A protein has these predicted regions:
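Solvent-exposed alpha-helices and their adjacent loops that cap or buttress functional pockets
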Residues: 6-9, 22-24, 80-85, 143-147, ...
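Conserved small/polar residues in nucleotide/adenosyl-binding loops
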Residues: 183-189
């Protein structure tokens, strides 16, 4: 949602409190400049040095609270992505924050949704919410086959990465997802 907000609000920079790539119990901040780019490790090291050594530049800034932005995000996705046919989808959120929005958005665009670990639970009791984690992928694969679903989606802890499982229970690798997404997003309907 933070990347969407950066474009939607025409913001120069972003900061998101997240633990997406950290072990359970650790939280971090993902920061970015320019549209769609997060800071590289060297830039994060520089920011860490500035913070720890209090090398701040005093200046003026402002805060603007935007009420109900989560619904702005959901509505944008829903209105821009209607489905032409009903799809049965397993949605695995690994008990992470994607459980707040992914099932609802997919239902709203016309999917029949089978939820898998979509309740928020910071202990992540079943598996690491990582679409590259084999335990998560196997759980999605089993649920797709058991429910005769058309597709399975597995979201990471903060919802900015997704893994995809086909109707046979096999992972669709990102080198295939990218071109299909590109074609869908660029061809006229």
């Amino acid at each position: 949602m933070v990347y969407f907000a950066q474009f939607n609000l025409n913001s120069d920079a972003i900061a998101m409190v997240t633990a997406s790539h950290n072990e359970n119990g650790w939280t971090g901040v993902k920061m970015g400049i320019k549209k769609g780019l997060t800071h590289a490790p060297e830039e994060m090291k520089e920011l860490k040095d500035i913070t720890l050594n209090q090398k701040f530049i005093n200046g003026e800034g402002n805060i603007k609270k935007i009420d109900d932005f989560q619904n702005v995000y959901k509505n944008d996705l829903i209105t821009k992505n209607p489905l032409n046919k009903k799809i049965k989808a397993v949605v695995a959120c690994g008990n992470g924050t994607a459980g707040i929005f992914a099932p609802e958005i997919l239902r709203s665009i016309g999917c029949e949704v089978i939820e898998l670990d979509c309740e928020l639970d910071w202990t992540f009791p079943k598996y690491n919410p990582n679409p590259e984690d084999l335990e998560m992928l196997h759980a999605i694969s089993s649920a797709v086959k058991e429910n005769k679903a058309d597709i399975g989606f597995g979201f990471d802890g903060d919802g900015d990465r997704v893994g995809v499982i086909d109707d046979k229970g096999n992972e669709i690798f990102s080198d295939k997802i990218g071109p299909v997404s590109y074609t869908h997003l660029t061809l006229p309907t």
